[in-house]
């Protein structure tokens, strides 16, 4: 029982471990943990070391916006808290509302990448590390990439827009 029984296709393994699993770990722990956990798993499945590192680091490029339970948004914007709290007296928005809006805009910017990045990365992986060294071998898995993008982005959008950046870091990645 293991990843080999789910799929022997390296492209599928890269998506499941490098994209979905690493994004979940980013939401739970953040701070570089996804690459530290996912890359050795890809190595154990027979990926070249450089390919495993590149896959994990590039796929982890946009889940970091929500980071470990929303830390980059909630803590990163904390210097604005006094300004926003002062604005509440004038009828402005609260710090929590501001963080939620930032999370919503973040989600909107990431949704296209949830579909583009997997296709590009599989093409890159097969071009430079595949047995046939062709882009088309990776691009031929575009249907699986679209499915993975939907599994990632639909819950991502719903959770970020309804629950906020803290929960947006985790819940949608479980669906992936």
List each model region and its residues.
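Hydrophobic transmembrane alpha-helices of multi-pass solute/ion transporters
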Residues: 1-3
């Amino acid at each position: 029982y293991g990843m080999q029984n789910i799929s022997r296709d390296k492209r599928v393994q890269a998506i499941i471990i490098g994209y979905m699993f690493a994004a979940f770990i980013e939401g739970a722990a953040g701070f570089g943990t996804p690459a530290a956990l996912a890359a050795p798993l890809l190595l154990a499945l027979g990926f070249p070391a450089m390919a495993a590192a590149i896959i994990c680091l590039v796929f982890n490029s946009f889940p970091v916006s929500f980071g470990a339970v929303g830390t980059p948004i909630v803590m990163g914007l904390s210097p604005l808290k006094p300004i926003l709290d002062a604005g509440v007296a004038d009828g402005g928005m609260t710090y929590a509302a501001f963080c939620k809006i930032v999370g919503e805009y973040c989600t909107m910017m990431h949704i296209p990448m949830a579909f583009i990045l997997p296709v590009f990365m599989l093409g890159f992986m097969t071009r430079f590390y595949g047995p046939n060294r062709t882009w088309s071998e990776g691009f031929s898995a575009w249907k699986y990439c679209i499915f993975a993008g939907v599994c990632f982005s639909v819950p991502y959008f719903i959770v970020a827009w309804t629950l906020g950046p803290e929960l947006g870091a985790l819940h949608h990645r479980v669906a992936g």
